[in-house]
Amino acid sequence: MKLSYLWRGLPGHPLHPPLTDATIGIYTFATLAGLVEVVGLTNRNGAIGWWLGLVFGLVATVPTALAGLADWLTITWGSELWWTATWHLLAMVSATVFFGLAAIFGHTAYTHANVSAGAYALTVIGFGLMTLGGWLGGAIVYVHGMRVLSLVDEPTERAVAPVPHPEKEMAEGS
């Protein structure tokens, strides 16, 4: 077992993608909770869910970003994959900045069980940037094929096994 498996995941089972699912889900919840408060569908619960969602999203961003950075550092500098991954990184960091600003500038309104228009606008901008970053992340995997092993004839029990096999390590180049 290699130490790098702790921050990069196993061959064929990278760590960054499942972490992004959780992080994107949390920020999506925060954006929707803020929306229901802004349009008046809730009287205070939307504001509480919005702000707590932003905070939990920011916490979840840390391991997600670190796992992504670990993958980014393995890419050949200046390659087309590197450019796509770098734009993905910039979009996601920008989204995080906007979500962070929304949490900071929206805290006072949150303490009064409200969502301010400015803080919610920052949330929506963050959500838009996150969506762009997700699109670019999809290109990294589905167009460039990063960390895709393409072992199409791998038996199911070996494909899903949480133990790295030599074929997987060789296919990933590790």
Give the residues covered by each predicted segment.
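Polytopic transmembrane helical bundles with strong interfacial aromatic enrichment
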Residues: 1-73, 77-174
